[in-house]
Design a protein with these regions (language model features):
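Conserved Lys-Pro-Asp/Glu-containing loop-to-beta segment of HAD-superfamily phosphomonoesterases
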Residues: 4, 142-171
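Substrate-recognition element of Asp-dependent hydrolases with the DxDx(T/V) motif
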Residues: 24, 92-118
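Helix-loop "lid/cap" segments that line or gate small-molecule binding pockets
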Residues: 27-28, 48-61, 117-120, 145-151
Length: 221
């Protein structure tokens, strides 16, 4: 039975689309790149930001550093809070917590920013720890973030842990650390993406995620 829940942040707990897209556009303007296919910038939601800039614009290391600097500049000023908690998430966290489960945030977003988002939406009390990447560009992969949680909480039992996320990076991170995973379809991944990396379970929305927990007797109604 699962007793420890690792939640991705962007696209799983909150919908950060407006803030992330605006942060990317701000950064691109600063480095002299014009993006005409703005709808395709959804791909920046979830993966490490450095990776997204490299894959889409074939940036050099120096260009990535500049782009990330400006991305974070806008994010800190406005982008973090151009964001919304998905409907049903608060109830889900309340039920998981009151049923005695342990809950963590495991995100590729820098820890300092993730904590600001969680605090802004008054969700801090539901999480035992909030773990993200480092501002210096280290610990950006989801497998590294999950491994860090396991290392700093040695008492955790992998067989009782499950990672919940909307992108393949969440599932890959779980697989590489030997824990189960739930891929959610209400974020920014698709069923094909999550199936190809062997998500343990897939749910279509927050309501189905809630009922999954009920059926598994993981929460008390």
């Amino acid at each position: 039975m699962y007793k420890t829940f690792l939640f991705d942040l962007d696209g799983t707990l909150t919908d950060p689309k407006e803030g992330i897209v605006n942060s990317v556009l701000y950064a691109l303007k600063k480095v002299g790149i014009e993006e005409v296919h703005i709808s395709e910038l959804d791909s920046f939601i979830g993966p490490p930001i450095q990776q997204s800039f490299i894959e889409r614009y074939n940036m050099s290391e120096g260009e990535v550093e500049r782009a990330v600097f400006y991305f974070r500049e806008y994010l800190k000023q406005r982008g973090l809070f151009e964001n919304n908690v998905y409907e049903g998430i608060l109830k889900l966290l309340q039920q998981l917590k009151s049923s005695g489960n342990r809950i963590f945030v495991a995100t590729s977003k820098p820890t300092v920013f993730a904590k600001q988002v969680i605090e802004h939406f008054q969700l801090t009390n539901y999480f035992e720890d909030i773990i993200g990447s480092n501002l210096d560009g280290t610990r950006i992969k989801k497998e590294e973030i999950i491994a860090h949680i396991l290392q700093t909480h040695e008492e955790l039992n992998k067989e009782e842990m499950i990672m919940i996320g909307d992108r393949k990076h969440d599932i890959i991170g779980a697989n590489q650390n030997g824990i189960a995973s739930i891929g959610v379809l209400y974020g920014y991944g698709c069923e094909k993406e999550l199936t190809e990396v062997s998500a343990t379970y897939i749910v279509k929305d927050v309501e189905e995620l809630y009922h999954f927990y009920v059926e598994k007797n993981l929460i008390q109604q």
